[in-house]
Amino acid sequence: MLNVIATGLSLKARGKRRRQRWVDDGRVLALGESRRSSAISVADVVASLTRDVADFPVPGVEFKDLTPLFADRRGLAAVTEALADRASGADLVAGVDARGFLVAAAVATRLEVGVLAVRKGGKLPRPVLSEEYYREYGAATLEILAEGIEVAGRRVVIIDDVLATGGTIGATRRLLERGGANVAGAAVVVELAGLSGRAALAPLPVHSLSRL
């Protein structure tokens, strides 16, 4: 029994050393590189693995596709580590449908807390709490379960992939607060600074890994 426990601790320590070998204080180390040599920032990693798609999902909108970032093991790990640092102290992470689920689940696992799925309208069984909002290309609805998950009194951090106008995170905040949660802040991978989402969400603390 003692040997099993010791082995588990050893594996956990080795895993931590592997993460620290290339993620150090918000910097991402190249393979085989030491902390004494140069490193690139998480923001640079995000920018290098983000694909710009013109006129999607509607004409006139430039879509920030983070699929290559999430598919890259180093990129995903660096983003997870950085977002987890900004969400420290939360006892529940709220991930926004759909790409927010990817990072929210990873961050929740890193923090050893639960994750709440904030779904698009019509995806959850009733009863639900619903909130309509407007984004840069139309109206939408977000929902959370009204029963079965207790959020009242819990310190929640909202996690999403992109902050644009602030409509999505604002609606998520209202939903959580209607359920009695203490929304401590929001953390996103990419912030589109020109769309003033941060100002729209004030005074909610907002953390972004990259501002484009």
From Swiss-Prot:
Cellular compartments per GO CC: cytoplasm
A Pfam cross-reference name: Pribosyltran
Keywords from the UniProt entry: Cytoplasm, Glycosyltransferase, Purine salvage, Transferase
Keyword Glycosyltransferase annotated: yes
InterPro entries: Ade_phspho_trans, PRibTrfase_dom, PRTase-like, UPRTase/APRTase
Biological processes, Gene Ontology terms: adenine salvage; AMP salvage; purine ribonucleoside salvage
Swiss-Prot/TrEMBL catalytic activity: AMP + diphosphate = 5-phospho-alpha-D-ribose 1-diphosphate + adenine
PROSITE patterns (alphabetical): PUR_PYR_PR_TRANSFER (PS00103)
Protein family membership: Belongs to the purine/pyrimidine phosphoribosyltransferase family.
Protein name in UniProt: Adenine phosphoribosyltransferase
Gene: apt
